[in-house]
């Protein structure tokens, strides 16, 4: 990997993350790299400025923060194919990030990257678009939105909790009308986030699939469904025309959906590219360590394992 054009992103408002970002920037500049640095957070989005400022392709994005900072990087950089080195600095769970211990000797990290001594993990993304008009002549409304974890469709109100009534269609066939708090359309990566909290299945991030999960449905028969990756999921809000439904991407507000409009969710035509520094990365170990995944309450010794 060449390190000619690098962006360094730190978690907004986090002093430790900012200090590591400044150190990384200085070292990369000493190696001759052109470096752009900026904060990322709920009120800070450095990526439009980054994209408008660079004069050559971005070789690397160093993202110092937690999972939220990494998700934002994936949403903005996947379409450009930028490799992301996400490091858990100032984060909490760190499900998508490399441990800080592997980043403390940054000079050694830059050497490894230049010698291509790392693994690249590609993760499926989602894209969503709001449409209005007839099915025969749909008109796109607003932007196209991207997510690494999930798209969430649920109503919003400032003064009361609203029950959603959503109709879902898959590849042109009406599946059901859901009554509850909303619907999740997730990637395998997102299956271990909001989806698993809503009693959805866990999918390995190395596969490509969609999983649709009702949020607190008012029916015992409403169950999650796993779909082929090329499926097209369309969701209509029904009932109250005075209320709008919100589309959320990875927990961030994307746009509003009004009755008469629908949101179409499909697999994106790009993937998030995460750099893995760990020698023995294990998804199952991550589940055990980060999500406290456990089976038997009493551990038993396996005498048959060599």
From Swiss-Prot:
Belongs to the NAD kinase family. This is NAD kinase 1. Involved in the regulation of the intracellular balance of NAD and NADP, and is a key enzyme in the biosynthesis of NADP. Catalyzes specifically the phosphorylation on 2'-hydroxyl of the adenosine moiety of NAD to yield NADP. GO terms for molecular function: ATP binding; metal ion binding; NAD binding; NAD+ kinase activity. Coiled coil: none annotated. Keywords: ATP-binding, Cytoplasm, Kinase, NAD, NADP, Nucleotide-binding, Transferase. It is found in: Cytoplasm. GO terms for cellular component: cytoplasm. NAD(+) binds at residues 67-68, 149-150, 181. Its main location: cytoplasm. The lineage of its organism: Bacteria, Bacillati, Cyanobacteriota, Cyanophyceae, Acaryochloridales. Disulfide bonds: none annotated. The keyword Methyltransferase does not apply. The gene is nadK1. It comes from the Bacteria. Its cofactor is a divalent metal cation. It is an enzyme of class 2 (transferase). Its EC number is 2.7.1.23. It catalyses: NAD(+) + ATP = ADP + NADP(+) + H(+).
């Amino acid at each position: 990997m060449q390190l000619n054009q690098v962006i360094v992103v730190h978690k907004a408002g986090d002093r430790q993350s900012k200090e590591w970002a400044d150190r990384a920037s200085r070292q990369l500049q000493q190696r001759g790299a052109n470096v752009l640095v900026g904060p990322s957070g709920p009120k800070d989005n450095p990526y439009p400025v980054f994209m408008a400022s660079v004069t050559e392709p971005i070789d690397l994005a160093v993202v110092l923060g937690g999972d939220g900072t990494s998700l934002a990087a994936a949403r903005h950089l996947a379409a450009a194919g930028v490799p992301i080195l996400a490091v858990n600095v100032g984060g909490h769970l760190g499900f998508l990030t490399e441990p800080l211990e592997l980043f403390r000797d940054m000079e050694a990290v830059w050497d490894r990257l230049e010698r291509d001594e790392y693994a690249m993990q590609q993760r499926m993304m989602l894209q969503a678009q709001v449409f209005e008009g007839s099915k025969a002549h749909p008109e796109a409304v607003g932007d196209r939105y991207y997510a690494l974890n999930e798209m969430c469709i649920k109503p919003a109100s400032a003064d009361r909790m609203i029950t959603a009534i959503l109709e879902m269609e898959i590849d042109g066939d009406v599946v059901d009308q859901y009554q509850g708090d909303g619907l999740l359309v997730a990637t395998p990566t997102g299956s271990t986030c909001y989806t698993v909290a809503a009693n959805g299945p866990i999918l390995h991030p190395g596969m490509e699939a969609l999983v649709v999960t009702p949020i607190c449905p008012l029916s015992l028969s409403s169950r999650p469904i796993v779909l082929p990756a090329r499926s097209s999921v369309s969701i209509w809000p029904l009932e109250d025309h005075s209320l709008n439904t919100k589309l959320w991407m990875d927990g961030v507000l994307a746009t509003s959906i009004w009755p008469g409009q629908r949101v179409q969710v499909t697999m994106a035509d790009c993937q998030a590219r995460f750099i893995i520094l760990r020698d023995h990365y294990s998804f199952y170990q991550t589940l055990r360590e980060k999500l406290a995944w456990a089976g038997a309450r009493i551990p038993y010794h396996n005498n048959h394992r060599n």
